[in-house]
Amino acid sequence: MEYFDMRKMSVNLWRNAAGETREICTFPPAKRDFYWRASITSIAANGEFSLFPGMERIVTLLEGGEMFLESADRFNHTLKPLQPFAFAADQVVKAKLTAGQMSMDFNIMTRLDVCKAKVRIAERTFTTFGSRGGVVFVINGAWQLGDKLLTTDQGACWFDGRHTLRLLQPQGKLLFSEINWLAGHSPDQVQ
């Protein structure tokens, strides 16, 4: 289990100066050719998403104005707060900020031939489904994960097992993504 606080994470500025990325985790760790990766991005200007052949991307707007996503002949979609949207990361997707407002997004990418991610929003205590990896990010409230207290802009990632996240207040929201491995694949096979 690895814990993080978004306010203390390293920030990587984009080459085109249109945004920045805070990488949460990758699997396998510290590998350029990852099977899955979670990050938080801030987008300050209209532009195109980076291409990642063979990957699926799920984007969830955390804060800021809505964002219009367009992929020629494939889709037009308005990204609304806390509504995950998945698309192939090997297609050109243009992002247009509405009302010029900067957005902050949670991104998870998975290699299509190896694993699949599912992103959800939780508002009550729950136990993960025994996936082989995942990420949680606290939107608001106080949550207990094992012996660790997580509050707004904090989270954790793991590479194995079931975990219970207990909401400690009457209200709270938590984004979580679980990674499930396709038949014939397992994190145990990765060196």
Swiss-Prot record:
Disulfide bonds: none annotated. InterPro entries: RmlC-like_jellyroll, RmlC_Cupin_sf, Uncharacterised_HutD/Ves, Uncharacterised_Ves. Belongs to the Ves family. PANTHER family: PROTEIN VES. This is Protein Ves. It comes from Escherichia coli (strain SMS-3-5 / SECEC). The gene is ves.
